[in-house]
Swiss-Prot record:
Source taxonomy: Bacteria, Pseudomonadati, Pseudomonadota, Betaproteobacteria, Burkholderiales
Function recorded in the entry: Catalyzes the hydrolysis of triacylglycerol.
Principal location class: secreted
Pfam family, one: Abhydrolase_1
Name of encoding gene: lip
Domain of life: Bacteria
Gene knockout outcome: Loss of extracellular active lipase. Not required for growth on oleic acid as a carbon source.
Protein name per Swiss-Prot or TrEMBL: Triacylglycerol lipase
Keyword Signal attached: yes
Family: Belongs to the AB hydrolase superfamily. Pseudomonas lipase family.
Subcellular location: Secreted
Residues engaged in binding Ca(2+): D280, D326, Q330, V334
Keyword set, alphabetical order: Calcium, Disulfide bond, Hydrolase, Lipid degradation, Lipid metabolism, Metal-binding, Secreted, Signal
Catalyzed reactions per annotation: a triacylglycerol + H2O = a diacylglycerol + a fatty acid + H(+)
SUPFAM superfamilies, A to Z: alpha/beta-Hydrolases
Amino acid sequence: MVRSMRSRVAARAVAWALAVMPLAGAAGLTMAASPAAVAADTYAATRYPVILVHGLAGTDKFANVVDYWYGIQSDLQSHGAKVYVANLSGFQSDDGPNGRGEQLLAYVKQVLAATGATKVNLIGHSQGGLTSRYVAAVAPQLVASVTTIGTPHRGSEFADFVQDVLKTDPTGLSSTVIAAFVNVFGTLVSSSHNTDQDALAALRTLTTAQTATYNRNFPSAGLGAPGSCQTGAATETVGGSQHLLYSWGGTAIQPTSTVLGVTGATDTSTGTLDVANVTDPSTLALLATGAVMINRASGQNDGLVSRCSSLFGQVISTSYHWNHLDEINQLLGVRGANAEDPVAVIRTHVNRLKLQGV
């Protein structure tokens, strides 16, 4: 009975995960950007440009229609910030010659050439935080700060789960077929129709085992000791360049009681009869994926990334009532009644960077 219950939970989670994947978090390295809003003030006018870095399954603008960072770039611009949005492969590893890290590095250099600035402030969501860390490690002189939002620095238990499910096929055909469809999807939603997509490499990148390897290859003072569920230093100096390090994440998905070996989960971002449960399909989907993570000992999470995994540098908060997409104001600005305003949180943080002189 317990095994049957777990199987049903797993099957539903995979289905819901596939439904939400298009919205989660290619190397279109053009400098095209949305028209800058007229600045009402200089609240977010940092010394160095801000680059927003998307995560898994992302792009700068889905199918050239919907912003990944929904409403965030225009808000920052209206407060005086110079903001650029990277457009990387939606499905790819972070390291390697074709990786997202090298794509982002090329984009950083373009932004610097276009603006005359000497450094940038990187703000990455989900996998975008790992990508940002790559650039800070290999080209430290180009980076002033790294901020990660809901980033799986220690990997994602849900990525482990998906990988384990795929391994149950002895032929390996399911992995190949699913990856082919996901790669095509990545090309279609990319604003530049980027064909550099590798879904299986992206999945491996986000597993707990592979992120441990990544952290050894690209260490950062912002990381705490492995297994400690602690953050690291608020600053680091790499090659003579100092980086300010920040993070935050959502923990809307919380464990409840355990029955027959299966622990339940609740979404603290939503209230009773919350409209987000109806108008935003990712709300229930991320509750399901978060439940899978809880049953793999993740603890509280945002549906894809646990609290412990998100810790990096100076932790602004891990108490936001957000799921993984709420962190970037998705889906289309809809969020639960208890969820904080992510646009305001990011605006306040960019002001924090301004006050720090970067």
